[in-house]
Amino acid sequence: DFIIMNIASVFNGNQDPGSNKLIDELLSTVIPDVNLNLNPDIIAKVIEYSKVATLIVVVDLNRPAILSSIDNFVDGLVGTFGVSDEVIFKMIFGDFNPTGKLPFEIPKSMNEVLLQKEDLPDDTDLPTYSFGFGLSY
């Protein structure tokens, strides 16, 4: 048994990923949420589900997110960029070999984000996942 949990980085995981890409992009531009932490309710669900079965978390990364709060509780973590549920399931069930590299780093904490230089990308001290991180198989 396993659980697949799909969360979005836009608005701290409170919105269904890809529910309306145009609205996602518009709202995240007009009303950017500077807090990259996941909502505490989402974190609690990840912890709860991790106790029940193997947990694969799929995060739609419209923007970077703080994933260190869930990283130790998941058996698999997949970062996506606006793909459909069908594509996610095909990848998980082995219909194709995924490949990909992060186009930005995933910071460990909001403190790291606040300490980085605005004009220098990927300069946090200890990111959870570095720029270019990714797996292929």
Which role fits each region the language model picked out?
Residues 1-137:
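C-terminal non-catalytic regions of proteins with extracellular/luminal or membrane-system context
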